[in-house]
A protein has these predicted regions:
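Pepsin/retropepsin-fold aspartyl endopeptidases
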Residues: 1-130
Length: 130
């Protein structure tokens, strides 16, 4: 794992934000952000998710949306985020990485662009007009 700088903004009020170093974690589906930091910028939960943690425990946590900006990519996108406990690491998960169209390169410790797969098998199947 390696870290990247991320700006986290409130989608409804982009002037409310903070910058933080996030661990790139391809094993985490969602990005994890300590809930007090999300609350500070006015992000509110939209629902909950059942999570399987790395140590095998299960937990139910709040889920919200935040605008994530990764300066090295020069792009901002709204991504789902988990309201994590106060002592949690900041994690940039697989959903955000896919949204940005990047993969983690552990050799260079950088995010690298990837081609998006659209529809997989169905998109490549021959089409019949009727």
């Amino acid at each position: 794992m390696f870290q990247v700088r991320v700006r986290v903004s409130n989608p409804s009020e982009r002037s409310r934000y903070f910058d933080e170093n996030f661990w790139v974690d391809t094993g985490a589906l969602y990005s994890f952000i300590p809930e007090e930091r999300l609350n500070e910028i006015g992000i509110r939960p939209l629902g909950t998710r059942e999570l399987l943690l790395a140590d095998g425990r299960r937990d139910r946590r709040s889920l919200g949306e935040a605008v994530l900006t990764i300066p090295q990519l020069d792009e901002s996108l709204t991504c789902p985020v988990i309201f994590a406990p106060a002592d949690s690491l900041y994690l940039l998960g697989a959903t955000a990485l896919e949204n940005f169209g990047v993969q983690a390169d552990p050799t260079t410790q950088q995010l690298k662009p990837i081609a998006a797969v659209i529809g997989g098998f169905l998109a490549s199947a021959p089409q019949r007009l009727t």
